[in-house]
């Protein structure tokens, strides 16, 4: 499922590039997921497993000790796009891809698979989150985008527009965390069992 080696990856504005299928990003061992953007925003692996399934993925088994994090990138005040692919795999089905240091998530939350929270429910909680599929284990590819200066946010799932031009967000991601959040309950909250293939951050809005 990895995509970095292909011809269609946009490089303009790319500030973080993590791809489990590319040996330049993960050579097959160790606890570092290497940022291929050249900006040094490597992620640290905490008790997660690499698999060759779907070309290369990381398996997060769920629980507070099993997660992936980066604490060097901050797009909270920048225009942004988060491009990622992930899926829930079990009943521990809360957060997967999100911001480490702020309340930001793209994709999975509380059993739902099409959620986008950027310090506000983009598209609205009822229209965006509750209207989507719950308890799905299907892979999905997400684009969560935000233009901070114009207060406009877009959300695409498998290239399908979920929300366009919404005004409910307020920040991009501060850091990266996959598998839980560090914001509440003594840094141990909303863990998820799932798989992730790639995560890319851009410091601009990508258009469909």
Language model feature labels by segment:
Residues 16-20, 35, 80-90, 142-144, ...:
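Short hydrophobic/aromatic patches on beta-strands that form ligand-binding or substrate-lining surfaces
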Residues 1-14, 23-29, 195-208:
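Extended recognition patches within non-cytosolic domains
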Residues 20-48, 208:
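Short, tryptophan-glycine- and acidic/Ser/Thr-enriched carbohydrate-recognition patches
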Residues 1-2, 123, 172-201:
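Extracellular glycan-interaction patches encoded by glycine-rich segments
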Residues 10-11, 76-77, 169, 188, ...:
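Extracytoplasmic/secreted proteins and extracellular or luminal domains
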Residues 4, 37-65, 72-75, 82-169:
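Extracellular glycan-interaction surfaces
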Residues 22-25, 89-91, 183:
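Short, solvent-exposed loop/turn segments at secondary-structure junctions
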Residues 14, 54, 80, 138, ...:
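Residues that flank catalytic or metal-binding motifs in active/ligand-binding sites
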